[in-house]
């Protein structure tokens, strides 16, 4: 076997390992559940989308849930963001980020409590996040 053939074999094997390793990760399905914890008697409007999928506007009464299910993409860059509105507030948050949520939310629903101070992920150890900067 000459050097060129060995190089092509090594390159092919490396590519296959990368390809199949990535495919194993790509099958991760995440269920996102959003809860209106803004406060008593406060309706929460929300609108979630990704760069290519619009989930439409929703309206949640206090303590009401709404959610969606998403298979993470091959490259691990899935991103869904939501716009939240209540009373005189308008906030944005990246509700599903593959790199942040894959491990925590792969086996259990990714439950988000939406609070005035920011969204808190209840899955696993509770962790609160700041709202996205307003553009």
Swiss-Prot record:
- Alphabetically list the UniProt keywords: Glycoprotein, Secreted, Self-incompatibility, Signal
The disulfide bridges present are: none
Q: Does the keyword Membrane apply?
A: no
The residue range of the signal peptide is 1-26
Q: What is its main location?
A: secreted
Which sites carry carbohydrate? 88
Q: Where in the cell is it found?
A: Secreted
Q: What family is reported? A: Belongs to the plant self-incompatibility (S1) protein family.
Q: What is this protein called?
A: S-protein homolog 20
Instruction: Identify the species of origin.
Output: Arabidopsis thaliana (Mouse-ear cress)
Q: What is the lineage of its organism?
A: Eukaryota, Viridiplantae, Streptophyta, Embryophyta, Tracheophyta
